[in-house]
Amino acid sequence: MNLSCSLVLLGGGKGERFNSLQPKQYTHLCGEPLILHALHAYQRLPFVQEVVVVCEEQYRELFLPYSVKFASPGTLRQDSVFSGLQQVSTPWVCIHDGVRPFVYADEVIEVCSAARKTGAAALASPATYTIKSCAPVRTLDRDALAVIHTPQCLDTEVLREGLLLARAMDFSLSDDTEAAELLGIEPTLVFSNRVQIKVTYPEDLLFAETLLSKSSTYK
């Protein structure tokens, strides 16, 4: 199966909850900015044809040693994704958050393969916590729920049409594959049994450092 695709790497978030002077994706993890951990992992994948980094101009110098395109971030995450999509030249696109430093080749391959069958796919983990809705308060069946991560892979035109529809509806998307859902496409979920870290708080960075420094599994 031909898995050729583009990568849109999101690096435009402000990260207010991280309590840092710089956006969390540029905070160092074991001597290297978080976002570069993800970039290096994707650049080792031969089927990734191009990389589009969505970031503020002041951070572009960090990526100059690499063969990447640039796009400017928007107000919402979906605006940033749409901005990056304008630089994509392949029929398939993979989206990855710059604050998710751990990327596993087998999972990217599985997500991209699954997307070819339905038009959209996302990496997921089973819900392990008890989750309640707030209004009204009631317990949800966690066996019917999943926690969604990146990578997420979509048909480029499906994503474009879904993002445009969301904009026309003034609808805020929770993730990228929800753009496909708006078009009536049911995304495929690829379940992972690994720890999936999204660095949101300073404690997340400490956890990531521990994993990266002490376990060869995450290197």
Curated annotation (Swiss-Prot):
Its EC number is 2.7.7.60. InterPro entries: IspD, IspD/TarI, IspD/TarI_cytidylyltransf_bact, ISPD_synthase_CS, Nucleotide-diphossugar_trans. Pathway: Isoprenoid biosynthesis; isopentenyl diphosphate biosynthesis via DXP pathway; isopentenyl diphosphate from 1-deoxy-D-xylulose 5-phosphate: step 2/6. It catalyses: 2-C-methyl-D-erythritol 4-phosphate + CTP + H(+) = 4-CDP-2-C-methyl-D-erythritol + diphosphate. It is an enzyme of class 2 (transferase). One of its GO terms (molecular function) is 2-C-methyl-D-erythritol 4-phosphate cytidylyltransferase activity. Keywords: Isoprene biosynthesis, Nucleotidyltransferase, Transferase. The record marks R17, K24 as: Transition state stabilizer. The keyword Transferase applies. Pfam families: IspD. One of its GO terms (biological process) is isopentenyl diphosphate biosynthetic process, methylerythritol 4-phosphate pathway. The record marks R142, K198 as: Positions MEP for the nucleophilic attack. Belongs to the IspD/TarI cytidylyltransferase family. IspD subfamily. Catalyzes the formation of 4-diphosphocytidyl-2-C-methyl-D-erythritol from CTP and 2-C-methyl-D-erythritol 4-phosphate (MEP). This is 2-C-methyl-D-erythritol 4-phosphate cytidylyltransferase. It comes from Chlamydia trachomatis serovar D (strain ATCC VR-885 / DSM 19411 / UW-3/Cx). The lineage of its organism: Bacteria, Pseudomonadati, Chlamydiota, Chlamydiia, Chlamydiales.
